[in-house]
Amino acid sequence: MPTHLVWFRRDLRLQDNLALAAACRDASARVLALYISTPAQWQAHDMAPRQAAFISAQLNALQAALAEKGIPLLFHEVADFNASIETVKNVCRQHDVSHLFYNYQYEFNERQRDAAVEKTLPSVICEGFDDSVILAPGAVMTGNHEMYKVFTPFKNAWLKRLKEDIPPCVPAPKIRVSGALSTPLTPVSLNYPQQAFDAALFPVEEYAVIAQLRQFCAQGADGYESQRDFPAVEGTSRLSASLATGGLSPRQCLHRLLAEQPQALDGGPGGVWLNELIWREFYRHLMTWYPALCKHQPFIRWTKRVAWQENPHYFQAWQKGETGYPIVDAAMRQLNATGWMHNRLRMITASFLVKDLLIDWRLGERYFMSQLIDGDLAANNGGWQWAASTGTDAAPYFRIFNPTTQGERFDRDGEFIRQWLPALRDIPGKAIHEPWRWAEKAGVVLDYPRPIVEHKQARIATLSAYEAARKGA
């Protein structure tokens, strides 16, 4: 009887799991599951404590769900990816594994690890799957067989390719012949700092995640275009955490969206949310083609020469939400308190750090990863390089958000700001966007800082720094 081992990583679900489905295809095979915790590696990659707590909860739910199918989950903890190579080898030897199944990860360290694992297992058949994307990297290329560097042509080619053959979702495995496991389960515990997360916003059980997806596609996807930019409105899906850890697949998102919004592929209702899924694909494909992105190198080479300011005081003020710009500060306090930030606010806060404070985007990228429950290297790096004008198809370097007008535009009445900045709750109407002006006129002393920089002057300094770097190319 063959023994099939499924190595779980960022794919913590039963439904539409390509590696798990392939491992269970042979009804006569004994199927085992494996998860390896690597705390030192996670620390090096700045994994957020809230994401660790989320993964821990998902693992325990996964363990119970697998047990109902008759599949035991083996849990091991080692320091890092290098140590995990030997662990996989030992598990395969101990359980006489004939086949190893896993879903690809596209980051540089992860790809090196997987290649090393396959090399150490010459007698084991290893099968990998492009599970975390809808279309595999390399499926969408230019006429010169190169990766697209601009999103819109990539999107058009991606849609054309998708319409030719939409990848199906695969069902969860059936109960193995041996039946459900009867032995008591030992709770999985991760040796990594953890912070509590809101399980109502970020559900753990698969059925709850799928219910969240169904509700959004039926009730929210149609209005996503008009509501997605306003942080005081519940206009986004909140599915990013489940996508980041693999509690949900992008194929599940696509199929549910098309079931509810069948015109989405042609730009109809739901099409803007589909765009977000395609952006996710774009950044993953880019990371596979350009591994330097995994090492936090800018895509546009001349931007390496930007003379960043080293100002710990400014950086700390940004981290804590004490910059004196309400929309920036409210956003950062939301991030610090919940592990999540609205996407429009991610753009605003990133732009402020880089183009108002002239601080290296990589410091912001790293801080976001250390806080985000939905931390994902490809998406986070892509977003920061877009905001910093260092990435492919990024905002031009001279596009600099005015944080005050961004607040006035996307939180006009200050509803979101008041939620996160209690010191400003009593400021009337739109005056909340420039509280220092209101305070001066009203003769009130606010428990809130004045702006740490003046935007117009900061903009001039940033343009000068970028132009000097570009001319040195």
Question: What are these model-derived regions, one by one?
Answer:
Residues 46, 315, 446-449:
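Short coil/turn segments at secondary-structure junctions
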Residues 234-423:
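Active-site-proximal binding-pocket segments
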Residues 145-300, 410-411, 415-473:
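Glycine/tryptophan-enriched, flexible segments
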Residues 21, 90, 329, 347, ...:
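A broad detector of short, well-ordered amphipathic alpha-helices
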Residues 1-166, 269, 464-469, 473:
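Trp/Phe/Arg-rich N-terminal binding region typifying the photolyase-homology
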Residues 7, 49-50, 104, 225-226, ...:
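Short, contiguous strand/loop micro-motifs
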